[in-house]
């Protein structure tokens, strides 16, 4: 996406975010992803976006980072259409935590420091790692922060990679953070550790959480259920459960799945004791 000829550098963001009357389709309109979607986040608010698989929830992050522009409507930050600004200056102030963050074949220290966009001290790196629940596993490695990890972090577990990605975002100090399925593919124990780190990361930041992890979504200030190109319902976790709508139905399926996993684990423990 090219910048407008008159685009200027974005100022420091306060963090208010709005998707206004958003219409978007990847394939020239044949299968619209959004049909007039409206969503506003106050500065510092945490909003979870949930809904059926395959409906394009992650497209919100694609449009916010201007990998595409909407066919109609606009995205505003602090009341300004983001197309007024140079895209690079917008992206510098938005942190993205994807499902599988990119890691380099370099030391853990360099992997953390490279994303900061400024010179960072060892003390800052350690502080960020502690926030991300990564410091203990890093210091347990033979070379600690000087440990060289494989290409794409192949020598680390999925949970360890996500915690390093969270530490990198902490060092960037972005006022807006987008979480795009950050716990997908992790085991239950790793999910819990990463979820706790996310809670600390987004403190005092605006957070858009696109997720199937309803335990993570339930912690948000507000939950938005997206379906058929728009918002089907919106509210707090408690409000949506009381509404007994699509979110409540999804939550019941989630709780049943968790209960089944816990029952299987209990049976396995019983078998190992005999």
PLM regions: where:
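ABC-type nucleotide-binding domain
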Residues: 3, 10-274
